[in-house]
């Protein structure tokens, strides 16, 4: 079942075309990594998928899923890292957009606690978010995204700024969500080797070339060979 279909998609940023005639689809249970050099339009594409930025032409179609069933984990900013709230408050805020209520209820709190437990950070629920390590903060934000996600997780550079141990732990969590719970994942990544290791499909965006297909097909392409040096 296809959850997302993009056809002949063109998008611009600050009046500059960054995506041109991009076509791909995401099926239920896919783990799609979006890779490519800086400025290739990866984050712009994310905004298009989330409905935050309209395409200049082409289509973005969601099927069997609404915008309130998508969890989003953006790149962290300095302001976010210093956010003055408890872990539970940060996570439970993820339920607000899904329920369209201004305030959370007992069910929302239960959902937040379940996701904290799922990511093995329930013991941190009363800690101040800004006091946590980078890896712990990213788990908290992922738990927040899961409060909104019932079918699809969209992640923008989820491992950015994390140490190698935290990166490995986060990829393990994402693999469990994808394989054991059939959560569909779309992730922008600057780390092509990790993308190849963890994804079943790759969308490579480039200024001159683009690729969409299965990971095993991607690693046979000239694009992959050129970037990795044939590793």
Predicted regions and their residues:
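Conserved ABC transporter NBD signature motif
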Residues: 58-70
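Conserved ABC ATPase "signature" region
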Residues: 106-124
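The feature captures the beta-strand-to-loop junction immediately N-terminal to the Walker
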Residues: 35-37
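H-loop (His-switch) and adjacent beta-strand-loop-beta switch element
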Residues: 201-214
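H-loop/switch region of ABC-family ATPase nucleotide-binding domains
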Residues: 189-190
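Conserved ABC ATPase signature
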Residues: 128-132, 136
């Amino acid at each position: 079942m296809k959850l997302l279909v993009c056809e002949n998609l063109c998008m611009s940023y600050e009046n500059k075309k960054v995506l041109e005639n991009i076509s791909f689809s995401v099926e239920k249970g896919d783990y799609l990594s979006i890779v490519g050099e800086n400025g290739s339009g990866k984050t712009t594409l994310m905004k298009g998928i989330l409905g935050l930025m309209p395409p200049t032409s082409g289509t973005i179609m969601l099927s069997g899923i609404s915008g309130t069933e998508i969890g989003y984990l953006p790149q962290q900013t300095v302001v976010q890292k210093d956010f003055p709230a408890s872990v539970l408050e940060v996570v439970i805020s993820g339920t607000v957009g899904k329920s369209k209520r201004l305030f959370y209820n007992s069910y929302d709190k239960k959902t937040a606690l379940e996701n904290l437990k799922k990511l093995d950070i329930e013991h941190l629920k009363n800690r101040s978010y800004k006091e946590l390590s980078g890896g712990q903060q990213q788990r908290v934000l992922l738990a927040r995204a899961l409060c909104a996600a019932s079918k699809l997780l969209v992640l923008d550079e989820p491992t950015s700024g994390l140490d190698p141990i935290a990166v490995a732990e986060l990829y393990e969590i994402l693999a469990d969500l994808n394989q054991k719970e059939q959560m569909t994942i779309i992730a922008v990544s600057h780390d092509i080797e990790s993308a190849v290791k963890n994804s079943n499909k790759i969308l490579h965006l480039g200024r001159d070339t683009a690729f969409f297909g299965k990971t095993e097909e991607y690693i046979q392409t000239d694009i992959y060979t050129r970037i990795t040096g044939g590793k």
